[in-house]
């Protein structure tokens, strides 16, 4: 006869056998909760029973913190647990790792499995996401025609960005036919390039009601879409696989509409600021050119000789008037263009309009540069003509040693024109008085 076992030895033996059985280390059990207690430490203690048996169960605080449902006596739950023995009492006990209400358990397990599979494919990664367009012209909506989500999205779009066209694809958002309809709507939007960005969503609901957005065909269609997609499924606390795969996740349908649209009032404010800056720029440019023309008009080179001043002053005046006229025309043209763009704001994307403004600014700047080049050429020619006139002016000739004679205010061109009276000899730096004296041989000498 073998030696009898101590009670503790037997309990330890049973404990080891249970813990060495891999099947019993992760088993799913369904039953009704009774004797439920939540300890101050966060641990949960309860009994799991059915009509024939019952077992004690414990769920430690770390695992209990992940339970999203309200557990209470009488609740029917599905648990994932390991089986062991509580040595002090020798009782077999369930050590619970996960727990959910029965009825959603299978769906939740499927959700977790699909989420892990899709995440492993890299579909959640940021580099897989498409950027949202800054100024969409067409916005697609895929949702139920009867739900509040459509009203919330459409109302927000019309308020914030009324110039965008709305392309609506009505679908079921729950039930067996929901997923195929959602897939077809996404594919249709892509095939026809029907919109620049797409909102897919519905209002809140249970996991069963939101399940269409956890099905693989819908998830795949979202991932393969060439059009950026904003997911707006349920409320802020609801998450579906579609939310993780979509390019952007919005907490609510209203938030989705705000994400895909700029604020029209802010855009108008920015446009007005650009208009003011453009007007200020051209006004400053015209003022600088006018000052330059004034400096040229009052320069020494244009004052002497007077004949040249008269000719060139007229040309400069015309050039100044032409520059002013062109400047005013440019400003009026740009102001009118900006006004026209504001009026066409409902039809043209802001980004394209700003780009066209930039191109118009470049063209105008080149035109003003050409005007500046013409003025500079005219100024160079003016200086050349002044130099040529100076080279033949009397002052320049006298600097080379020549003089001229005046008598009684008249210019004397021949010695025969001189009388016996005094006359004036003009040098470049002054004049002297002289008198004629005739020699006996008939020659005339100036004294």
UniProtKB/Swiss-Prot annotation:
Q: Which NCBIfam families match?
A: xseA
- Could you state a single Gene Ontology molecular function term? nucleic acid binding
Q: Which family does it belong to?
A: Belongs to the XseA family.
Pfam families hit by this protein: Exonuc_VII_L, tRNA_anti_2
Q: Which organism is it from?
A: Exiguobacterium sibiricum (strain DSM 17290 / CCUG 55495 / CIP 109462 / JCM 13490 / 255-15)
> Where in the cell is the protein located?
Cytoplasm
Q: What does this protein do?
A: Bidirectionally degrades single-stranded DNA into large acid-insoluble oligonucleotides, which are then degraded further into small acid-soluble oligonucleotides.
Q: Give a Gene Ontology cellular component term annotated to this protein.
A: exodeoxyribonuclease VII complex
The EC number(s) attached to this protein equal 3.1.11.6
Record has Transport as a keyword:
no
Q: What class of enzyme is it?
A: hydrolase
Q: Which GO terms describe its biological process?
A: DNA catabolic process
Q: Which UniProt keywords apply?
A: Cytoplasm, Exonuclease, Hydrolase, Nuclease
The record, for InterPro entries, names:
Exonuc_VII_L, Exonuc_VII_lsu_C, OB-fold_nuc-bd_dom
Catalysed reaction(s) here are: Exonucleolytic cleavage in either 5'- to 3'- or 3'- to 5'-direction to yield nucleoside 5'-phosphates
Name recorded for this polypeptide: Exodeoxyribonuclease 7 large subunit
Assembly and partners are described as: Heterooligomer composed of large and small subunits.
């Amino acid at each position: 006869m073998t030696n009898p076992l101590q009670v503790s030895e037997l309990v330890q033996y049973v404990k080891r056998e249970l813990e060495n059985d891999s099947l019993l280390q992760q088993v799913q059990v369904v039953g009704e909760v009774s004797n439920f207690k939540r300890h101050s430490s966060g641990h949960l203690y309860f009994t799991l029973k059915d009509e024939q048996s019952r077992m004690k169960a414990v769920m430690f605080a770390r695992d209990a913190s992940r339970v999203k449902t309200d557990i209470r006596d009488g609740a029917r739950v599905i648990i994932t647990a390991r089986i062991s023995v509580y040595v002090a009492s020798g009782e077999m006990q369930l050590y619970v790792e996960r727990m959910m209400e029965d009825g959603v358990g299978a769906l939740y397990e499927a959700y977790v499995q699909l989420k892990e599979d899709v995440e492993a494919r890299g579909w959640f990664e940021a580099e897989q996401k498409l950027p949202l367009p800054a100024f969409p012209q067409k916005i697609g909506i895929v949702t139920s025609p009867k739900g509040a989500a459509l009203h919330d999205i459409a109302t927000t779009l019309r308020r914030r960005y009324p110039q965008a066209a709305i392309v609506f694809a009505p679908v079921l958002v729950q039930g067996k036919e929901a997923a195929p309809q959602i897939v077809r709507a996404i594919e249709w939007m892509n095939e026809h390039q029907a919109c620049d960005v797409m909102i897919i969503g519905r209002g809140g609901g249970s996991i069963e009601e939101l399940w269409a957005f956890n099905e693989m065909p819908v998830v795949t269609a979202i991932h393969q879409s060439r059009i950026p997609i904003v997911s707006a499924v349920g409320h802020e606390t609801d998450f579906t696989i579609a939310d993780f795969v979509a390019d952007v996740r919005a907490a609510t349908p209203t938030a989705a509409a705000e994400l895909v649209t700029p604020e029209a009032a802010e855009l108008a404010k920015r446009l007005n600021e650009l208009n003011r800056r453009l007007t200020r720029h051209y006004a400053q440019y015209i003022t600088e050119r006018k000052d330059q023309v004034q400096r040229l008009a009052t320069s020494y080179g244009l004052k002497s000789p007077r004949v040249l001043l008269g000719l060139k002053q007229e040309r400069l005046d015309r050039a100044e008037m032409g520059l002013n006229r062109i400047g005013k025309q440019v400003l009026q043209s740009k102001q009118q263009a900006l006004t026209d763009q504001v009026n066409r704001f409902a039809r043209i994307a802001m980004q394209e309009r700003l780009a066209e403004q930039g191109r118009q600014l470049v063209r105008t700047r080149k035109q003003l540069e050409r005007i500046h080049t013409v003025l500079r050429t005219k100024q160079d020619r003016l200086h050349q003509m002044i130099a040529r006139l100076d080279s033949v002016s009397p002052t320049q000739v006298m600097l080379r040693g020549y003089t001229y004679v005046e008598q009684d205010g008249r210019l004397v061109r021949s010695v025969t024109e001189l009388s016996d009276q005094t006359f004036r000899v003009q040098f470049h730096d002054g004049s002297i008085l002289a008198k004629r004296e005739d020699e006996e041989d008939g020659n005339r000498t100036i004294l």
